[in-house]
Amino acid sequence: VVDGVAVRYQYGGQAGAPVILFFNGLEMQEMWMPYAEKLGKKYRFLIYEYPFHTTNADEQIDFAAKLLKALSIEKVILIGASDGGVYAQIFAKRHPESVLAMLLTTTLTVDSDYVRDIRKERFSTPILLLLLKLVPAKTEMKLLLKKSTGFLACESEADREYGRGFYETVASDLHYKQRFIQSFKCVYMLKDYPLFKESDFEYLRGKIQVLLPEKDIFKKEDQDRLADLFGKLDAEILHGPGGHVGFIVQSA
């Protein structure tokens, strides 16, 4: 329990090793399990469900910092994917005393067309949120599974099969509807977040890695902006085959 809020989390791995803190998108914490199984042989890891009490990005991240304190974790290595990559950047900016290094994969930064497009939906988003709340959970999960087919179109057959199984498993839990709506709200709140500056991450110079898939769901221009921001900080920028889902659900 942190600030009176019950937290569901998994904390395991190699005792005494550096701790990896995972940030994910769409409230799909399950995506990190293949990574935890592999990295847990050398590192400690922490995966947690984002709390429902706030959709404000800074408050969400400060809550994560309080969770670390409650677990007596002083330093972490950040790994963020999809929208979770933006959360990792916010954590690195707000809590530099807690960060050893940062890895970002198949993600972007606040200075992106993705976020600018969200700003254009100021009037339509509240209506969409209302509809999401009214639609029965089973129907909403079927729609999510149908939409996931588009995410998987550019993946290899092996990754498509893995991705389908992953989405089906997540959607089989009808309680995921509330997590999905919460995630939708949190992403919408990023629309007004201030742009990051190079100085925000100067302390991590040479300790940042950015992994970019060849066929990401995010625009190449957004990938380039992310690479430009961290390339100035001597980050290792790596490009690889595959798409958004393949990078996330497979731990390679």
Predicted regions located by residue number:
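Conserved HGGG/HGGXW glycine-rich cap/lid loop of the alpha/beta-hydrolase fold
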Residues: 5-54
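Active-site loop/oxyanion-hole signature of alpha/beta-hydrolase fold enzymes
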Residues: 46-81
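Gly/Ala-rich beta-loop-alpha elbow adjacent to hydrolase catalytic centers
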Residues: 80, 84, 88
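Flexible "cap/lid" loop of the alpha/beta hydrolase fold
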Residues: 93, 102-134
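Conserved alpha/beta-hydrolase catalytic His-Asp/Glu region
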Residues: 113-115, 137-200
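Short beta-strand/loop motif that positions the catalytic acidic residue
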Residues: 204, 210-212
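Conserved alpha/beta-hydrolase "acid-adjacent" motif
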Residues: 217-222
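Catalytic histidine-centered segment of alpha/beta-hydrolase-like enzymes
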Residues: 242-251
